[in-house]
Structures are given as C-alpha cells and as structure tokens.
Amino acid sequence: MIRKVTKNKAYIVIDAIRNPYEAKFFKDRYAAFHLVSINAPAEHRSKYMQKLHKFSSDQIDTIEKIESGKTEGEFSAFTNQNVKKCIEISDIHLFNPKSEFNNNNILKAQIAWYIALMQHPGLIPPSSMERVMQVAYTMKMNSGCISRQVGAVVTDSHNSIKSVGWNDVAKGQVPCSMRSLNGLIEEFNPVSYSNYERNNQAFRIKANEKLIKIKEVNLKSQIFEGHNLSYCFKDIHNSLDDKGNQVHTRALHAEENAFLQLTKYGSSGIEGGKLYTTASPCELCAKKAYQLSIAEIIFIDPYPGIAQEHIINIGNNAPKLIQFRGAIGKAYHRLYEQIIPIKDELEHMIDL
C-alpha cells in the first residue's frame, strides 16, 4: 500500500515489538523482516528513564515486571510482553550505552551499518564478534534441552576458536528431548532413565500425575497426538520439596561444556581468552570462567542471577563483560552473503 501511494521503495520500522509470537509472525510472513533489539546496561537504562521520562524507581520496577513475561492471566504465555525472549530471538543486536545522555553516535553508526547491508547484502564482511557468535548460535541447535537451547564458544585472545559447547547431558546419556513420561512409567529402560527415576516412588508418583493429566486432556481434544511427552527432571524433582535448585539439572551448561572440551581433547591454555555465549554465564559457569582467566565474556541475554554482581565484578583479574552487537542466525547469512559477486555486479553496471 505504501509503495502504491508513494510510488517508491518503502522501508518500514515497527516500534516496538514486545511479544515474541508477534515477532515470529513477522519473521515467518516477511522474508525481509529483521527483529532488532537495542540493548543498554541496566544502570544506564534506569538513569535514562528517570531523567527523560521522570519515572520513579517503583515505576521502573513495574515496567520491568510487565515486560518480564511472568505476569499471570488467561493465555498469558502467548499474550504477555516478554522482552527477554524477544532479545533472545532477535536477528540484529544493537548496543546503545547511555553514559552520555545526548550522545547517540554509537547507535547511529550501528544503524547505518545494518541499513547499508539490508540495501546491499555482502557490502562488507562480518566483524570477528559476529563471526564467532554465529558459531555459538549454530552450536545451540545441538542441545537436547526442552527448556532452552544455549551455545558457547571459547577462543584465544585473537578470536581463534579453541572449543565449542552447548547445554546437554553428558556424552552417552539420552537427552531430555528424546525421553518421555510414557517411557519413564512403562519401560524402565536403564539406559534412558536413571536408577532414581525408576525406583524413587515420590518422583514416579509426581511424574505419573503429570502423565495422567496429559492423557485426560488428550481424550477431549487429541492435542498431544504425535507429540513426544518429554519432561524436565529438574522441574519434577524441585516440585517435591518446593525448591528451585539448579544443581538438579541433568544437562551441562553450554559454557561448562565448552570449558570441559578444552580438557578432554587437550589445549595449549586459554588464559586471556574469550568466552562467547548466546545467553550469559550463571554463577557456577562465571566462577569457572574466572578461574580459567578468561579476559572477556561476550553475551547476548543477561542472566537473571547475581553472577555479575557477586562473582565477576570482584578481585583484581575480573573478566570484562561485553554485550554482543551484530547480526546472528538467518540475518547473518541474509546480510553478509553477496547476492551477486561484487566483481560481477560492477561489470554488469558498466554494461547498463
């Protein structure tokens, strides 16, 4: 419609998408759609909102809660604002520090970079940060976790890749995505299900309650037909004692897995190196990164715990936390892959 009215090219910006399913609709509907996240350090963002919009600390906390994706209500999982998830699935990540209130030069430079690539894919090559993070993004697809897929890469100080990792169970064990409640209750397979899962009555009762509930729903709507009824061991175990203990996860974290590959297959040392992660390190992985003398941690999605305040920002050899900026996933290929080799393009332009 805009093209017809203006009789010209149309470049459209939608401000602002805060629901991940809205974003996925546009991603699936329009091939040229790019979901862009603009990130700023939490302390900069708070000061900016207080100064520009005159928000109080309580008002900012309320906004954070609304945008967290955790508010309750009918169909809330599908209709809630969830900025954290939107950042996770973004195609392009921009960094907008607000240490100087009126200085937007860093943001402007990044916008110019990606607009140029949208109009002319392959005009310039990706940055080293983008190149390595794209590998981490690819690695996360190997994860068999049914909650969240995370990828990680460890490099030396020159961004030469030394190891990769993703969140998954130890080698030789069956990932959660390939296990099921049916198998747990009926099969007693010692390869797929642990001795605890096969013999602890409290755990099995809780798991069976979940399976019965699913079967009751399926009798009415057949909604689960064709689905593997995977389950999260941690969720069921924690529900027994009403504790949110992260120790009970079956999977290694992606960062932890990448560190272990260095030991498993040998390494010349990683002191002063870098950790790239599609999430950000938890408290346990942050300690491991610190002990390995990782110099920089490049992350996409800030971890909600106290890893930064309690583990990383202390001592005299603290790793530097860097928010990722760049294109990733499909956008990486769409923006950096030349449609026509530049040499051929120039030759064709001469002939026009």
Question: Where do the protein language model's features map onto the residues?
Answer:
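Short, well-ordered beta-strand core segments
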Residues: 35, 92-94, 297
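Short beta->alpha connector loops
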Residues: 16-20, 280-283
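Small-molecule kinase domains that catalyze NTP-dependent phosphoryl transfer to phosphate-bearing small molecules
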Residues: 51-109
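Short beta-strand/loop segments at the ligand-binding rim of alpha/beta enzyme cores
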Residues: 7-12, 30-35, 265-274
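ATP-dependent small-molecule kinase phosphotransfer cores
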Residues: 1-11, 17
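Zinc-dependent deaminase catalytic domain
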Residues: 1, 75-79, 84, 97-352
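A short acidic, amphipathic alpha-helical/loop segment
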Residues: 24-29, 284-288
